[in-house]
Amino acid sequence: MIKQRTLKTSVSTVGVGLHKGEKVQVTLRPAPANTGIVFRRVDLDPVVDIKASPEAVGETTLCTCLVNEQQVKVSTVEHLLSAVAGLGIDNLIIDVDSAEIPIMDGSALPFVYLIQSVGIETLNAPKRFLRIKKPIRVEEGDKWAELLPYEGFRVNFSIEFEHPVIEKTCQTMSMDFSSCSFIKEISRARTFGFMKDIEFLRSHNLALGGSLENAIVLDNYRMLNKNELRYDDEFVKHKILDAIGDLYMGSASILGELNAFKSGHGLNNLLLREVFKRTDSWEWVTYEGDKTSPIEYQEVNATAF
């Protein structure tokens, strides 16, 4: 039987929030089977839990933000969720003492390391996969995203940026996660932004925690970071990283093929909402006996790089 996963013990880290620029502490805690992924605002009295779900997603302009009926928010959740998804974690309580998850280095790698530091515990309950049975597609102008039936998880993603640095890189990427490693191939890809947009955001008291230490920053012609790209195709790989996190709002790995063109947080969420709305287009599946997982989850103690 392929079993559900959580952490062996709790683990904490501290970082800076992207938009407020304030210090934030996050603690990942083990959770029982069938809990899902729950964000807990421990800075509030009483504490407030917000379970990751497609319907809980509110603002998606600059990041993915969860919000409840009382307008309590937790923003910038996508990189942490991407790490959780990439390591196949089904159940987790995430304590956070702010309205945003720290940006860390702009990728999912610090959260992967955090989980690796304590290890993964298997639970005596079958792991549930969301298997796509029929094509599901959403569009927004020239942007689109779709999920097709596939016995595994495959991603075909394209971006289109008219910038001399990005145009020199591959803007289309195909990856099959039945064989490739999320940790090695995706987790290190950093978020990126343009100087003109950052200046506008800061004039509105946003992106106050953004820096060359946690993002790839581009002016009109070049990359301002001194260090080279972590991947030759880091820009499109970060968009895949985001999509993996956004599509994990259902606290379950998807069995299907994701095809996307210029998709972002909003369209990713719209696609997942459409999936849950069209109940005839998907089903829950578990794997009993000696069957192996259709998605490759990196063993946390293995050498990933």
UniProtKB/Swiss-Prot annotation:
Its EC number is 3.5.1.108. Its cofactor is Zn(2+). Catalyzes the hydrolysis of UDP-3-O-myristoyl-N-acetylglucosamine to form UDP-3-O-myristoylglucosamine and acetate, the committed step in lipid A biosynthesis. PANTHER family: UDP-3-O-ACYL-N-ACETYLGLUCOSAMINE DEACETYLASE 1, MITOCHONDRIAL-RELATED. Zn(2+) binds at H79, H238, D242. GO terms for cellular component: membrane. Keywords: Hydrolase, Lipid A biosynthesis, Lipid biosynthesis, Lipid metabolism, Metal-binding, Zinc. Pfam families: LpxC. InterPro entries: Ribosomal_Su5_D2-typ_SF, UDP-acyl_GlcNac_deAcase, UDP-acyl_GlcNac_deAcase_C, UDP-acyl_N-AcGlcN_deAcase_N. It catalyses: a UDP-3-O-[(3R)-3-hydroxyacyl]-N-acetyl-alpha-D-glucosamine + H2O = a UDP-3-O-[(3R)-3-hydroxyacyl]-alpha-D-glucosamine + acetate. Pathway: Glycolipid biosynthesis; lipid IV(A) biosynthesis; lipid IV(A) from (3R)-3-hydroxytetradecanoyl-[acyl-carrier-protein] and UDP-N-acetyl-alpha-D-glucosamine: step 2/6. Coiled coil: none annotated. Gene3D superfamilies: lpxc deacetylase, domain 1 (3.30.230.20), lpxc deacetylase, domain 2 (3.30.1700.10). The active site is at H265. This is UDP-3-O-acyl-N-acetylglucosamine deacetylase. Belongs to the LpxC family. GO terms for biological process: lipid A biosynthetic process. GO terms for molecular function: metal ion binding; UDP-3-O-acyl-N-acetylglucosamine deacetylase activity.
